[in-house]
Amino acid sequence: MDIHRIHVLRQRGGDVDGLPREVVVKDRESKMRKYLCWLDGPWRGKLAMAARPRGGDWLRDDMASWKRAGIDTVLSLLTPDEERDLDLRDEAGEAKAQGMGFGSFPVPDRQVPRSEAEWAEVLEKVTRALSEGKNVVVHCRQGIGRSGLVAACLLVRRGMSPGAAVELVSAERGVSVPETSEQRDWIDQYAVALASTK
């Protein structure tokens, strides 16, 4: 079924290939929930990893779907160039319009954060939100490399070894994460830095 046609028919309130609009929307909602990879951790809230929401006309729908799926806070790892290219410059506003918190910590695709101190601060904020019982979704472009980096480091922060954290996140995501050896090394380095502060 043509995606553009679905969008136009939904705007007009009509049926899509003989299916009532409500059925199509409900099916889309179930698929959106599948795109959220939930990770249970040692927190009251839940962490989800995801690919970036669709931009442009679809952004509001995807933000609303995340809210209905139980997301309280969105953390984007996209760079400003990616936000522009993917038509996601309004993501913060749309998230807030849905009653969700929004944070941005740009990390270039397939790379690692530029600042260890800023990285630690972001992880502290996410940990605090999760500990308060909030559900947080972290996304990059495909929800693998940079998102996996955040998820693994959050688990390391709570006492898991880097290897076990990577294994768990990879198993839950259904694909090997993170994407690069540099990202994997960053998790090890983060664990060493964390241990030195205790």
Placement of each model-derived feature along the sequence:
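Short cysteine clusters
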Residues: C140
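Cys-dependent protein tyrosine phosphatase-like superfamily
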Residues: D2-I6, R10, G18, E22-V137, ...
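Conserved G/P- and acidic residue-centered "switch" motifs that form tight phosphate/ATP-binding loops
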Residues: G143
